[in-house]
């Protein structure tokens, strides 16, 4: 990878200590965390407390307690904290957001967002598959499976594109594949602060699907649709 041996660290804790020991003009300025979910909170808090900017892959963490501790660390640090979601950087997503924000659709009334995958249609975690193993393990993934893994993308997309804040949810989570410890399929009914309603679907047992994300938003004067095919 072209990394100097002295900066190839055995752990995130060693990395932070090693970088803090370097002169200010040589040390890392930004730490990007793309570890499994259960290794999000501790390195984020330590990095922020150490003065490093943090870019963290979604989801934020695995519990409300961790989330509050991370929020406190971010507020008390002079460093910046960023939580990333894949699709908000797409040009057409930004255009969709702009169209709605500019009033082209009128007041938002309805939001439909779906994220189907099929890679967990079988008991893949039982086949020594590294990604499947940790993503379906409650100790590493958290309390939810598909909804936490890809439902977070759909939720983020619904709020980002529409400009609405989701304030009420009613969810049904299903575990379809026998032996799986977490949900692999789910649907959510939601309501926003303005009164708009919507439906969110996230599933990883839609055989044949990869990342065919789709969002539709309807307002008083019209609607729009974006699909990742």
Question: What feature does the model see in each segment?
Answer:
Residues 7-73:
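Beta-loop-alpha module in the N-terminal Rossmann-like domain of NAD(P)-dependent dehydrogenases
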Residues 1-4:
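N-terminal Rossmann-like dinucleotide-binding module
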Residues 130, 149, 153-229:
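Contiguous beta-strand/loop segments that form the cofactor/metal-binding neighborhood of enzyme cores
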Residues 33, 56, 62, 81-83, ...:
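Hydrophobic residues in well-ordered beta-strands that form the structural core
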Residues 80, 87-180:
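Predominantly a Rossmann-like dinucleotide-binding segment in NAD(P)-dependent oxidoreductases
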Residues 39, 59, 82-89:
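Rossmann-like NAD(P)(H) cofactor-binding subdomain of soluble oxidoreductases
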Residues 14, 30, 42, 69, ...:
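Alpha-helical elements of Rossmann-like donor-binding domains used by nucleotide-donor carbohydrate transfer enzymes
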């Amino acid at each position: 990878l072209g990394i100097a041996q002295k900066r190839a660290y055995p752990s995130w804790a060693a990395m932070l200590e090693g970088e803090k020991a370097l002169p200010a003009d040589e040390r890392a300025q930004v730490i990007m965390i793309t570890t499994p979910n259960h290794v999000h909170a501790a390195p984020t808090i330590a990095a922020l407390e150490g003065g490093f900017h943090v870019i963290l892959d979604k989801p934020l963490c695995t519990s409300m307690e961790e989330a509050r501790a991370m929020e406190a660390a971010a507020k008390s640090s002079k460093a910046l904290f960023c939580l990333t979601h894949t699709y908000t950087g797409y040009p057409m997503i930004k255009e969709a957001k702009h169209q709605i924000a500019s009033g082209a659709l009128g007041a938002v009334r309805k939001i439909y967002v779906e994220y189907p995958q099929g890679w967990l249609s079988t008991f893949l975690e039982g086949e020594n598959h590294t990604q499947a193993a940790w993503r379906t393990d409650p100790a590493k993934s958290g309390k939810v499976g598909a909804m936490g893994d890809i439902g977070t993308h759909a939720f983020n997309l619904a709020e980002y594109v529409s400009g609405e804040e989701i304030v009420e949810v009613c969810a049904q989570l299903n575990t379809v594949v026998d032996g799986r410890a977490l949900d692999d399929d789910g649907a959510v009914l939601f309501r926003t602060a303005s009164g708009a309603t919507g439906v969110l679907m996230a599933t990883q047992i839609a055989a044949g699907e990869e990342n065919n994300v789709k969002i539709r938003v309807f307002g008083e004067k019209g609607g729009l649709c974006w699909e990742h095919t």
